[in-house]
């Protein structure tokens, strides 16, 4: 078995906010490092890795196989959460995108308002605009 990698600071911070035992959806997964790491460390048992582009999704699949993530990791070609149903995720991570794009994804996904859902958002830009948009939409911003 290949040794498990260490998450960089940005993804490690996101991992800390994911609830133990949850079902995760990682939007814009790219390499799927976050769901692979969470699965391999036993923090979660299932994850859905989503990306809008086929290339990064194929890279994620290869990484899942390389690190033996197992059947707990599935993959989906999706623009944001458009191809994800509410029962497929309890915690949703959207990291590494601009704040405006994150806000668009959140606003167009009504089921994220369910109080049982947790959003872990890590914007690369437009942080004040994202915070304001989330507050105006009725979301509670914790950190």
Language-model segment annotations:
Residues 2-7, 11, 83, 88, ...:
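Class I S-adenosyl-L-methionine
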Residues 1-22, 36, 58-87:
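S-adenosyl-L-methionine
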Residues 89-96:
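Short SAM/SAH-binding signature in class I
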Residues 46-51:
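Conserved SAM-binding motif I beta-strand of class I
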Residues 53-55:
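Conserved SAM/SAH-binding beta-strand->alpha-helix loop
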Residues 21-30:
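Conserved class I S-adenosyl-L-methionine
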Residues 31-44:
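Conserved SAM-binding loop of SAM-dependent methyltransferases across substrates and taxa
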């Amino acid at each position: 078995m290949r040794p498990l990698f260490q998450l960089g600071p940005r993804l490690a911070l996101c991992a800390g906010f994911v609830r133990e035992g949850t079902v995760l959806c990682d939007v814009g997964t790219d390499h799927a490092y976050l769901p692979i790491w969470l699965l391999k460390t036993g923090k979660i048992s299932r994850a859905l890795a989503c990306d809008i582009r086929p290339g990064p999704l194929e890279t994620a699949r290869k990484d899942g196989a390389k690190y033996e993530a197992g059947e707990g990791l599935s993959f989906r070609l999706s623009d944001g959460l458009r191809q994800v149903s509410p029962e497929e995720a309890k915690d949703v991570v959207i990291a590494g995108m601009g704040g405006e794009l994150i806000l668009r994804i959140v606003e167009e996904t009504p089921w994220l308002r369910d109080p049982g859902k947790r959003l872990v958002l890590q914007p690369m830009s437009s942080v004040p605009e994202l915070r304001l948009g989330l507050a105006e939409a009725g979301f509670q911003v914790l950190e």
